[in-house]
Each structure stands twice: as C-alpha cells, then as structure tokens.
C-alpha cells in the first residue's frame, strides 16, 4: 500500500497530522537562522531556536519531510556516495517534533504505531537501542510497547568520554542534550552483520531506520546535566531507508526514485549496465545539485557555491567515465521532478533556471575535464609507488581547476592513494604567499583599537555639532595635532557615513573658528567612526568642539547610486530569475558597480529589459520607507539579506513601493524619482558564475547618453549619412569588407599555387623521398598552411618544412603526405625545429605548426632537418 516513496512521505505526514502535529514545509537547503551551518542537514535545523527556547510558534507539535544535504564541512558523505548502499549527498528526513509537549512515552508509541500499524512491518524484524542508563525508555519499550527485553539493547559510552555515545545526543559542548533511542530493521540472515552493540554492528544486516532524541538536560560547562523545565523531542527517519524496506530491496539505490534516475541517465548516456556505480553517483548528485540551485545556490569558487560545483563536476566526471560525449546532467531534471512528486514544488517552479545553471557548469567543466584528465593520466603513468604526490594534486587543482576529490576518485579506482598532507601543505603555502602579498604598510583598520562608540545622525542630518573624543596619527593615539597633520579624528556623534555595505565613506569638513580639517574618507573602527584626512588650518585636540559638515553634493550623488542598486537587484531577479543574489557592490558619487550570481552571460535583450524595468520604477516615483524591526520579522516580510553579511537582531529595512525590500544600513534618496535616469555602461563576467554590471545615474547618466549620441552622430558623418541610416550603412560596409577579404583569400591561394610550382622544383631526395626545407621571404604567416597543402599535392609523396623569420618572431609549418606518416610525423618534426628557435608547437601527423622567438637561429635549425630525416627515412 505504501510502497512508493511518495506514498510513504504522504502516509508519514498524514499519520502525524492525525496525532495533532502541524505539518510544516521543508525549509530551504540554505539555513536561514544558523550562520555556522553550510547546508540544512537535519530535520531539526529549522526548529533550532524553538528547542533553545528563543522562539515560540503557534504549535507545539510539528512534522516535516525535510530536504537535507551532507557534502562539505563536518557532515561530508561525498567520498562514499555511489560506493556504499546508503551514503548520499541529498536525502529526505522524515521527522516529528515536540517543543515541551509530549515526551518519551508518546514519542516511542507514535514511532512503533506508525511502523507496525500503518506500515505493517513485522514486529519480530525490529529491535531497539536505548542509552545504558535510560531505564525509563527501556521500561516503555518493554512494559508498554511489548518489545521483548532481549530485543532492547543498552548502548553505553562507546566514544571514549562520559555521555559520548551513539545513544546520547548533544548540540555542543554545552546546551541541550539527552539520551536517544533508535529503531533497527533486520534485513535477514543472508546479509552479513550483527545487532547494534555487537562486534559485527558495522555490517548491513541491521539498519537504523528511526532515531528519537529526548532533549531533557542542559549541559553546563563543568559537565553537569541539569534537567530542562520543558523536555523536547526530535526524531528523524531517512525516507530512502524506509522506502528500501517497504519496496523489498536492500540498497537505497534500488528504490523507485533512484531506479528512475539511473534508467534515465543510462538512456541519455547510452549504457546498458544499470549496476554501474557511476550511474549511482549521477543519480544521487542530480538530487543535491538541482535542489541546491532551486534554493538559490549557484556554482562558484567559494562557500556553498564551491561545494555545489564539486558535486556537479564529480557527476560529470562519472558521466565521462561512462562514455558521455555531450552534456547530459541537466537533462535529468524533468525525471527528478516527476520522481519526487509533491516534494519537488520548488524545483518545478525553478526548472528552467536549474537546467540552465547545470548545463552552463557542465559545459564549462567539459573543457577543464579533458585537459585535467590528460594531465592526471600522464602523472599516474609515470608514478612510482602507490601514492600520487601532493604537489601534483595541488598543481592540477590550482593551475587547471581540477577538483581534489576528482583526483582522489580517479586514484581510488586505480587502487592508488593521494598524498593529502602534501596537498594541504602546498595549499597552506599558497595561502601564506597570498596573505603576505596582501599586507599594506599602514593598515588603520588593524592598528586602531577604538573603544569609544560614535552616534551616527547622518540619516536625517548633514551637519552636526560634535566633540573630538580621540585623535590618531600614523596609527598612534595623540592628544593634539597642528596644521599639516594627516589624522583619523573620532567624534562623539557625526553625520558622516562610514564605508559599509559597498557604499563609500562620506567626504566633507570638520570646522571651528580658525580650524579646518578636510575629511577625505570615513571608516568604521569597531563602534567608533573615524574621519580620515588632513588638518589644513589651525590645531585640534581631544575635547575640542567641531562642526561636522558632510559634502552635500557628493552624498546626494552617492545616494542616487545606492538606491538604484536596490532597484537593479530586484529587476535582475525579475528578469533573470530568483537565483540571482548580490555578491558585492561599490557605490560612490560617480558610478555604481553591482556583482551578482548568474550562470551565463546576460543577453542584450535581457540587459535592456533590466534597464527599462529600473527606469520604470524610477518614473513611478516610489517613496522610500525605512523601518527598524527584528531580523526574523524582516525576513518574513520578504526582505533580501545579503549572504555573508552579519546582522544584529534589530535591522533597518528599506522598502521601495512593492518592488524592492532589503536589509540596508546605507543612505538613500527620499523617492525613486530623485534618481532621474539609470544607464548601464557595461556588463561582463568577473569569475565563474559571477557577473558584474556597472552603471551611472542622474546627471552622469544624462552625460553618458549625450556622449553616446555625439559618437553616433560622428559615426554617421564618417559614413556620409544621418543617425537613422548608421546601422544600414555599417552593414553595407561590413558586407563589402567581407567580400574583399574573400577575394583577397582567393588571390593568396592563387599566389600560393604559383609559388608552390616554383618551390616544388627545389625539393631534394633523401633515400627516394622528396624533401623541401625552405625559409621564405615576403610571405605572410597566414599563407603558410595553403602553401604547404599545395606543395604536398605537387610532390605527391614527400615532406615539407616551411619557415618565416623576421623581427623577433618565427613561424613554422610542417607537412607530411599520408603515405609517409608511419615514418615521419609532422608534429615531431616541427617540434624539433621549434625547440632550436625558442619555441614549441605540434599538431597532426600530416600537418603541424609552431612558433619561435629567435629568428637568428632559424637557418641553423633548418639545416638540422635533413640529418634528422636521414635517420627516419
């Protein structure tokens, strides 16, 4: 009845709904409330604050089918995926939770009732474990549920310390903790393995299917356990494991979801062996990759994006092993959506974006893979021993972008090891070099330790009466300074905005009678705000009163550019997709720069749509609203938070109509209409998966448009027409140029044919083979290929080596007729000559090209050709 995975999921949630639980949707794979966590890896993650007593919800019982990823960081199953029956990068965790409501008795009863009642699993196939001192749980299992005592196994502290046990759960060194009870299923005597707690427990016969954690203590720093006033329950059952049991199979990869994905992958790639482990890897990895992209993660070189990139590339590499010659991975997404059923709502909504992102990464990696595998194969061919050295692994990673885990995978398949210590040492050395290169002589942010807090009044004021609370000169605290001194001035309150969130610091002046300090930049130093600049007039000392005056014009222009980045961010998400997230920005008075995640170049029509959408919002003249609220409330309202930014519990939310809502501490215009005009000046890629837009606003945008118009009019004049006819006239000119190029190429071919007739007569014979070695004058490098083709046809059977040498450049081409390539290879010949003139090259056995940088050595190099050929002909 509940044999399909989809039916099992529904049955679990419905059972707990009937037991008074609130069915809660799976949270994102990107944790929203835990910066310490790379990915959501357990059902309890989204309820962490509930368990800690920091959040109260409208329900005290919950049930979920939570999407989880374990790859990277502490919980990393990547290396085992595909090679074992139960390791995955992606899995679904069925869970029921109690926040101070029911406890051990009900939690145990619910689990047993669902397994033996709803799913009708044979009771004799089940055994349970409890923590060795948890007599309460033992008695519930034995006396209330009726599990025989011999099927209840007490597990002690088996990890070398008090409470360090498979059956004692701890959130950390301190905090909530408690014993747990686990339910195991016996797959039968035909599979090796023993009951939990036995020497053979690592076998596959007895498989844990449900873990029930009883959070009943609060662990203190001294190790003592204090009872919690409201104990809680956290449970988890992997849907893949229970599906395997219900479907009568042993390996998770044999269940319906995986079988559909494996069959589809085999069909796309064109393989018949459905037991191949590479198909398992691909089937697992498409689940984690597709859902990660759907939840907003894009392939990149850092953080979550890098883990995603590694998983995609591992899948592609296994496809390559199976013989895939074209992109295949993204084509599994429709099958995944169908197989996951109701659990794929978010994936279905973002299907197009997911497919595009996976395809783009696959195409990019195809180039890296071919080159990297060639390098790795060469290194392994020369390997002495059974361990690939760390330097080679690092070179593959650093120079060729070949992931370390793929190198380890290839070595593993060949029963070889990887020198991880050597790789880590090479990586550490590179980091230290980078850190040394990034050190500056005067790092004020590191040097100034300012304890004083500065009040910022610059949201509403551009001038303020302030008092000097600290002065710094050359990184040292001073009490006073005279004219000419370069200083950092710290005030008790200031209207100057300190650089933050991409917005540059304000400029302006600090003034008093006979005193003028020109502020060139404003920076944060802890809780203090430092005004960096030069004392132009008079003297100042700690305790002086000054008037702080922000440069209004510069601030206003900066505000135009900052406000429009919010509109740009929202527009990009509307036009390109909700996967777009801000990756960095620079906002100054002259321009704005906005970096964002996207897996391919932005098309011209998409860029125009973004620009038009932003300008539409400017014309709508939305009033900007600013509000302070709790961060969770802000996120609930849909406010965009920037990944990597740290926010206080209270945040400032900036809203522009119903178009944009973001967390932001920067300064802004009053209405979007103040921006006037938005104009994109450039768009391009700055890193894999990261794009950059540069733009201008207001008067700068008007000036940019005027400049473009002037250049267009100048182009029209050069083409002897008006602006309206520029495109047509330019097309005509390009067509004419292409025709002339075609005619020029034909003429060169004729000249080459004529020249070849003359040159063929200069061929000499070596052991009956015609050989032509010639240094040419007055011939362009582009004509060499056609000329050697003509000469080979004229000679019918022979070897040709042509060279051009002038200035500091040498061009070489070698040609060998097909009947002689068994004796002489053009690539070897041209490489031999190139090596003598400071160059290198290669190519096919019948034709190869090379370059060099030492024309003075060319004649000597050409003289070596005949002796070289004598040895081979």
Curated annotation (Swiss-Prot):
Cofactor annotation: Zn(2+)
Key word Transit peptide present: no
Annotated localization: Cytoplasm
Record-level GO BP terms: alanyl-tRNA aminoacylation; negative regulation of DNA-templated transcription
One Pfam family here: tRNA_SAD
GO molecular function: alanine-tRNA ligase activity; aminoacyl-tRNA deacylase activity; ATP binding; tRNA binding; zinc ion binding
Keyword tRNA-binding: yes
EC number: 6.1.1.7
Reaction(s) catalysed by this chain's protein: tRNA(Ala) + L-alanine + ATP = L-alanyl-tRNA(Ala) + AMP + diphosphate
GO annotation, cellular component aspect: cytosol
Cofactor: how bound: Binds 1 zinc ion per subunit.
Gene3D superfamilies linked to this entry: 2.40.30.130, 3.10.310.40, 3.30.54.20, 6.10.250.550, Bira Bifunctional Protein, Domain 2, Threonyl-trna Synthetase, Chain A, domain 2
Domain of life: Bacteria
Family annotation (HAMAP family): Ala_tRNA_synth_B
Known role: Catalyzes the attachment of alanine to tRNA(Ala) in a two-step reaction: alanine is first activated by ATP to form Ala-AMP and then transferred to the acceptor end of tRNA(Ala). Also edits incorrectly charged Ser-tRNA(Ala) and Gly-tRNA(Ala) via its editing domain.
Family: Belongs to the class-II aminoacyl-tRNA synthetase family.
Comment on protein domains: Consists of three domains; the N-terminal catalytic domain, the editing domain and the C-terminal C-Ala domain. The editing domain removes incorrectly charged amino acids, while the C-Ala domain, along with tRNA(Ala), serves as a bridge to cooperatively bring together the editing and aminoacylation centers thus stimulating deacylation of misacylated tRNAs.
Protein name per the record: Alanine--tRNA ligase
Designated gene of the protein: alaS
